[in-house]
């Protein structure tokens, strides 16, 4: 039985790592989309910036862009 438990723990750890990798890939993809929209990912948009979307990363959830001056 100890061999089966070691395999189970190894498989569980591998699944957790895979879940983290796929989340990171999505965050990188959203950051690239924000760059294409001429924005940047920040924790909070500054007063002279407008929120144009979400980066959905833990530390930088908003995609911010400078407001256009009329």
Curated annotation (Swiss-Prot):
One Gene Ontology CC term in the entry: extracellular region
Signal peptide: 1-26
GO biological process, one term: defense response to bacterium
GO molecular function: lipid binding
SS bond partners: 41-55, 45-64
InterPro entries xrefs: Beta_defensin_dom
Alphabetical list of Pfam families matching this protein: Defensin_beta_2 (PF13841)
Domain of life: Eukaryota
UniProt key word Signal: yes
Keywords, ordered alphabetically: Antibiotic, Antimicrobial, Defensin, Disulfide bond, Secreted, Signal
Subcellular location: Secreted
Tissue and organ distribution: Specifically expressed in testis.
Family per similarity comment: Belongs to the beta-defensin family.
Role this protein plays: Has antibacterial activity.
UniProt-recorded name of the protein: Beta-defensin 107
Species for this entry: Homo sapiens
Gene behind the chain: DEFB107A
């Amino acid at each position: 039985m100890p061999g089966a438990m070691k395999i189970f723990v190894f498989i569980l750890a591998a699944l957790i790592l895979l879940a983290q990798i796929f989340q990171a890939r999505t965050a990188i993809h959203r950051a690239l989309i924000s760059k294409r929209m001429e924005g940047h990912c920040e924790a909070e948009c500054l007063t002279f910036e407008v929120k144009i979307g979400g980066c959905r990363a833990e530390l930088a959830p908003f995609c911010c862009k400078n407001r256009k001056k009329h």
